[in-house]
Amino acid sequence: MDVSVDTDYLNTLIRNPVINSEAAHFLYDERKIDPRIVRWCGISSISQPTPCWRWGKAFYDAPSLLIPYRDVDGKLLSVQGRYMGKEDKPRFRFPRGSQVGMYNKPVIRRLKPGDELWIAEGPSDCWGLLSAGLKAVAIPSATSLTKADISLLREGLPEGVSLHMYPDNDEPGMKLFEDLKRWFPQLKGHVLPEGCKDFGEFYKLGIKRE
């Protein structure tokens, strides 16, 4: 049975973003994310378990970040929950039926000829790249890309836009880079400093990029 994401309800859920104390600690204290990026991405948070559709029971655990996924024109596709509590619960949750693909697609419309577009493994690393002044999207796995995403990155970018990535310093990170390299041969890999497991850690330590 096909299940449609209740984007009308989800829009009301994130219309007026709230950053609770747990979210503020995670975003600003731990990750050092620029508040302007939090606003640009429309990140919100919840302190009580919350449904993902108007007549449903609680779906998103609390406390959680609410992370909107949008298409290139800003239309809401779904909202991912990112659990920040200490109980043994799933860290990431999407409403059933979500088909979101790449994260932060609206940044594509801000690219100019000759720009760099950076690829992160997940939203939090994407926020770090954005906070560092880079234009970035996130692709958690090569299999999460939609056909439209692949077409967009291959043929829909302004002239001269180059693709870049700091692969995570682990086996899954290198595998993702290699998988994406098959789709996008022009993708350029960059090496993180020794001891940094991902770009988010690199960014919050304040290390300057070479």
Model-identified regions with their sequence ranges:
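Short phosphate-binding/catalytic loops that engage adenosine nucleotides
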Residues: 32-33, 134, 185
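TOPRIM metal-binding catalytic domain and adjacent DNA-binding surface shared by DnaG-type primases
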Residues: 1-66, 70-73, 108-113
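Acidic, metal-coordinating catalytic cores used for nucleic-acid/nucleotide bond scission
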Residues: 142-146, 167-177
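Acidic beta-strand-to-loop metal/phosphate-binding motif
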Residues: 119, 160-172
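Short beta-alpha junction loops
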Residues: 169-171, 193-197
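Short, aromatic/basic amphipathic alpha-helical patches
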Residues: 153, 175-185
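Phosphate-handling DNA/RNA-contact segment within nucleic-acid enzymes
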Residues: 47-159
